[in-house]
């Protein structure tokens, strides 16, 4: 019989740091007695083998001599809720993460979360400022764009935050920049152990506090509130939209196209 279940529900891709989750879980299990470790399970609802990630069963065979279970079936919403509720705690330590849907899902199901303090995952951590109010998107600027530096450490009881040990910026054409923040797997193991130590009624109470937080319409995590805000912003955009004036061409001069003259083997040209 298991008395501590850790749950992961996301893709097996590199930026999700799935291998680090397994290695952190192994490090945690190494730090407790064998008897206690045998009562722990890591459930991973993901594709065990993915070209965008790695071969997780092979990784477990070689690096994690503890109980790891893979869930590969596709479930409807109600069944996913049951799956979340088999867990005592969830874990999400992604890098390059815009939001991290799994984090909100776990909290809505009343399951506390071990989370990397980066990107949008910070939004559901419930960080508080000096005056006791919650940190919001309005507090972020181009000069200070993330709490990954630990400026505010007072957080909601429903999360076990892991502060990134490596902070950098990545990007692409559609996403010019995003935080590539990665935690040390040993720091993750420490937070797993803290959650394990709280297992039972204390951990359940933390999860229920998180559920209460994300269901509060003021913070905008539930779908109905997201839709309401989206509709409001679109209406506001349309109301304030001012089309550009038409450009009239009158007696435009004729443009003569000329072939470029290439300058030898250089990459410059003259027109």
Across the structure, where does each feature detected by a protein language model lie?
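Conserved donor-binding/catalytic core segment of Leloir-type glycosyltransferases
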Residues: 1-16, 22-25, 42
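Nucleotide-activated donor-binding/catalytic signature segment of Leloir-type glycosyltransferases, i.e.
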Residues: 39, 44-48, 53-78, 82
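Short acidic alpha-helix that forms the nucleotide-activated donor recognition element
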Residues: 75-87, 108, 185
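Aromatic "clamp/platform" in nucleotide-sugar-dependent glycosyltransferases that forms part
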Residues: 95
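Short glycine/serine-rich donor-binding loops of glycosyltransferases
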Residues: 100-103, 121
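Short hydrophobic beta-strand element within catalytic cores of glycosyltransferases
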Residues: 112-115, 125, 132-138
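C-terminal amphipathic helix plus adjacent low-complexity
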Residues: 156-271
